[in-house]
Amino acid sequence: MPDATGVIARNPFEEAPSRLNQYTPEEAAALQARLEKKLGPEYISSRPGAAGLKVHYLAADKCINLANEVFGFNGWSSSIQNIQIDFVDESPNTGKVSLGLSVIVRVTLKDGAYHEDLGYGHIENCKGKAAAFEKAKKEATTDALKRALRNFGNVLGNCIYDKDYISKVSKLKTVPSKLDVGDLHRHPDFAPIKKEPMRVKPSLEDDDLPPNPSIAGRNTSTNSAADMDAEFGSDVFDEADFNVGEGEYPDGIVAEDTQKRHQPPTPVGRPNAHLNLPKHALGAQASGNQHVVTPSKPERPMNLAPAGRQIPNQALNNRPFPPPAQNQYTNQRQSVPLPGSNGGLQNGRSIPLGQRASNGMATGSDAGAQVPIKQEHGAKQPNPAPQNTAVPATPGINGQGPPVVGFLSARGADMLRENPHSAATVAPAFNPHAESPSIRKTAGVDHTKSIPISKPMLAGSASPLSNQTRDFINPSAEMHRKIGAPSGSVVGGPMNRGPSVSSYRPLTRPNVDPKAAAQNNTAAANRMAPNMNGKRPPLNDVTNETLPGGNGCTPAPGLNDPKRAKYDESMSAQQHQQQHQH
């Protein structure tokens, strides 16, 4: 009915028309294929049940995540249709509550299809009614939701009721998942700060370098044909070189032999000539040309290096090159060509294309703009046919001769590093036969030769004594150990330390004259015994008692004392005292 403003308001008691989004046949088929798959062992949980058996189930959180994954977060919904309380009992003595209830939940998809099922929850002997109803209703709702979702297919839990499947999948082992901190939703105040990668600042010597061929190759798609020719020079990347049509991919086509094709003439006004590049060189340039030699990047010892092309002055960031006498390349790295080294091969190896002088090479100022490539020193080669241009020999770094290459000692290497040119004649050479005094060597073995070691060679040398035990002995456990003295049983002590090999000398017997030995034996036999019994006299006891008539402690005379008066037992005690007085 219209209101005061004349606008007809909708009846709030009427149900709103449902907006259904029907699945297309393709979506329905894809959804059906997902629902028919069975779950992996990582989704299935188990708990102990009756009679010692395990009860397998699908946790509620995993079930909801599976529904969102299959249907989408906005592709399904759930609603509680009915809650029925079955019983509520309260104990009159303890006041504890026991109840049970059932809940019916409906799960509806976005196209209107739905399933509903029953869930049950209960609690026994709860202290309060509120806690009892909360626990029972949540349990029943969760149970009803899982049972309603399993009606859609195996992937939502229906496969758990297959005993044959459970018996097989429960034997599979799962690897615990690792927590990825980057996937966590963090609060902005506690989120880790992402550090930007450090940008390498280009050095001053790289300001006038030619552009990277890989970067320049990517920019050619947006440039015109004239700009491409001006930047790369001539028709280096022409279709004739690749032998590829307009609709073909050049990386999958094998280029024909470059020696059988005739090189196109050099157009007038273009600074560079056409270079015949081999197949591997073309592939290297297409993939980034990582072997380009620049003043800041030394060359690599490869048999075939990329071609050193000449780059026009107008293409180098619109900055002309300085004259050849002030060229930066000649100040940092100059090639050292040898006489007659313009051939195609050197000692059976191919020379990089940048070292050859072709018929179409430019001369004069263009030669100074070319990126030179260092050439190896090899044997003399036959002089090839005369070329149109000749590359003059250039000195080494800073106008000096090339550094001397050889084997030097460690001290010589340090001297050569500080002054590579003047120290080459003064630095000591490496001596492979030098003997170091700090290295111990086995006695009796010739270390200057490589020969097998036999047992007679080692007969004169003794191996160091090995330790008697490796177990640690507590020094306090020795009862007769002197305070401050090292223990005799400690591993590595001076008592157990074996003699070194270098200082060991075998024991030798002294040369004894047999006549002198016989005289010594005769003199020892005629020597008188120390006492009448021919034995060592026994030790006497010492006392500190004061004898009568004496001033101090006088030790009692021993039995074998020569100053003691000898008497017979039959003598009277009177005579014995008189002898002592005398």
From Swiss-Prot:
Annotated segments matching region Disordered: 194-226, 310-400, 485-582
Subunit composition?
Part of a complex that includes RAD51, RAD52 and RAD59.
Family matches, as InterPro entries: DNA_recomb/repair_Rad52 (IPR004585), Rad52_fam (IPR041247), Rad52_Rad59_Rad22 (IPR007232), Rad52_Rad59_Rad22_sf (IPR042525)
UniProt subcellular location: Nucleus
Keywords from the named record: DNA damage, DNA recombination, DNA repair, DNA-binding, Nucleus
Q: Which residues bind DNA?
A: 146-150
Native species:
Emericella nidulans (strain FGSC A4 / ATCC 38163 / CBS 112.46 / NRRL 194 / M139) (Aspergillus nidulans)
Into which family does the record put it? Belongs to the RAD52 family.
Mention one GO molecular function.
Answer: DNA binding
> Compositional bias (Low complexity) at which positions?
516-529
According to UniProt, the name of this protein is DNA repair and recombination protein radC
One Pfam entry for this protein is Rad52_Rad22
- GO cellular component annotations, sorted alphabetically? nucleus
DNA repair recorded as keyword: yes
